[in-house]
Structure formats: structure tokens, C-alpha cells
A protein has these predicted regions:
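Class I S-adenosyl-L-methionine-dependent methyltransferase catalytic core
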Residues: 1-199
Length: 199
């Protein structure tokens, strides 16, 4: 697999065995929305898998990227990719947490940690997309005007409205949906989860 955005564009990275890779078109679409220059911003990659999205964020100069991956083998591959790319040489911070994504959301809320971009791509068969979205709404770890980016299976549905989050994009890419929200602190919040997005 190759990185397609930013400083590391064209660089290869390791893929864990059995992981479903995030399509190039989808990765490009995400960064076309959130921007190709993430200087000074923090990025959280939940259910990180190969860590492809977090690596793209580092390539786009995100100041800090946190990868959360429960599977030890996958987490080790992400660590190997960070050794390969050496983001610290560009003054960027990257950390891999080998733990559960839902527990991590609660932990960050207790610690007062906040992120500018949160990406999540849980295993499709478990239908965890909406549960993850609700956890992010309940345990607010997002900065004002932050983005939430969700990739999930076609069998799931996501809300049109989610608290103070505005829907920016909803599109099918192969066997997955991509839904992007932006937080808007000035907007009166509608019901936490309203409407659905899907087929």
C-alpha cells in the first residue's frame, strides 16, 4: 500500500495480514474535505487497523496523531510503519495505543483530551458505527469546528443530525459508506441522533 497525500505521497507502508485496506478514492475524498495541510492539528484514528488514515494525516503534517488499535499484531504493524516514516524528524508526534476504542474515548474525556479530527472505521460485521458516533457525542473529546469522519459497512445507517455536528458528506465507496460531520459550537443542538444516512 502507498500513501497518497502530503509529504509521504508515494511511500509504501506495511499492511497487517487480513486487514481490509481503505480505498485510495476514499482516503483522497477525506483529505479533500478536511484539508491537505493539518499543521498544528491533532488526529485520532480509532479502530486503526493498518493505521492508513493516521499515516495520511502525518503525511499532511498533523502535529499529533494517536492510533488506537485493540489487536496487538495490527498495533505492532502501525509501530513498524512509524519507524519506517520517522515523523519525529519533522517535529510530529505519533502514539499507538493497544487498547479498546470505546474505553479510550472515555479515558480521553476524563483526561480532558481533545482532537481536531476523529476518524473511525470499526469492523463492518460488528455494526459499531452508530455506537462509536454516540460515544463521541456522549464523551465530548472534540475541539470547536472539528471533523468526525466515519467509514462503515453498507448494512449500517448513520444520522443526518448529530448534536452540534453538521453533515458535510455522505457517499458510498465500494462496500462502505463515508460520512463526514463538522462540529459547530454556534448551532443549537438538535436531538443527539436524528434521521439516518445509508442506502
Amino acid at each position: 500500500m502507498k500513501i497518497i497525500n502530503g509529504e509521504y505521497s508515494g511511500r509504501n507502508f506495511y499492511m497487517p495480514f487480513g486487514i481490509r485496506p481503505t480505498q485510495n478514492l476514499l482516503r483522497k475524498a477525506v483529505f479533500d474535505i478536511i484539508g491537505h495541510d493539518l499543521s498544528g492539528l491533532s488526529f485520532l484514528d480509532l479502530f486503526a487497523g493498518s493505521g492508513a488514515m493516521g499515516l495520511e494525516a502525518l503525511s499532511c503534517s498533523a502535529a499529533e496523531v494517536c492510533f488506537v488499535e485493540h489487536d496487538q499484531r495490527n498495533a505492532k504493524v502501525i509501530e513498524d510503519n512509524l519507524v519506517l516514516l520517522e515523523p519525529s524528524k519533522r517535529g510530529l508526534k505519533a502514539k499507538v495505543l493497544h487498547q479498546d476504542s470505546f474505553a479510550t474515548i472515555k479515558q480521553f474525556a476524563r483526561e480532558g483530551r481533545h482532537f481536531d479530527v476523529v476518524f473511525f472505521d470499526p469492523p463492518f460485521g460488528l455494526k459499531l458505527g452508530k455506537k462509536t458516533l454516540k460515544a463521541l457525542l456522549t464523551h465530548d473529546i472534540l475541539t470547536p469546528l472539528s471533523h468526525v469522519v466515519a467509514q462503515y459497512g453498507l448494512e449500517e445507517r448513520m444520522p443526518d443530525t448529530a448534536g452540534r455536528w453538521t453533515l458535510l458528506k455522505h457517499k458510498q465507496y465500494g462496500a462502505s459508506w463515508l460520512t463526514v460531520y463538522q462540529k459547530n459550537e454556534e448551532r443549537d443542538p438538535p436531538p443527539i441522533l436524528g434521521g439516518v444516512r445509508g442506502g
